[in-house]
Amino acid sequence: RLSVITFGLAQIGMDIEPLIGMLGDADVLHGPTHTILGALFIAALVALVAPYICRPILRRLNQEAQACRLGWLSEPEPSSMVVWASALFGTLSHIVLDAFMHADMHPFAPFSAANPLLGMVPHDEVYYWCFILGLIGALTWLISKWLIGRKLKA
């Protein structure tokens, strides 16, 4: 299982530093938060606040699904384990994807300034695969929810 809301919050948390850097015209946009240690710290913060953000959003989405007679799309509140896994997956995958594209990334800092992933996958291809895999994930989720909903009716 994965909490898409928590995963999304983790992505937002990771990009706060680059946003501040862009607004301040900084030379380095991907600093301490774009390291493995920084990602672990942000994941912990996200995992701690996510339940308070997820509950009202899920409650509203589930109400709307019921009102539209799409109750089979309803989602339960994620467990603590799912929240933590989603936050970690969100921040660590962010590090990997950004490391392919950004020369100012040092994912292993403070232990190493190396970025062995830089340039391994072309910039546009990273976005292409994110789109394709996101689409596959969304379709898989939708089909599995539909099949489970049909099974419950039978």
What is each stretch, according to the model?
Residues R1-A154:
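N-terminal membrane-targeting hydrophobic helices
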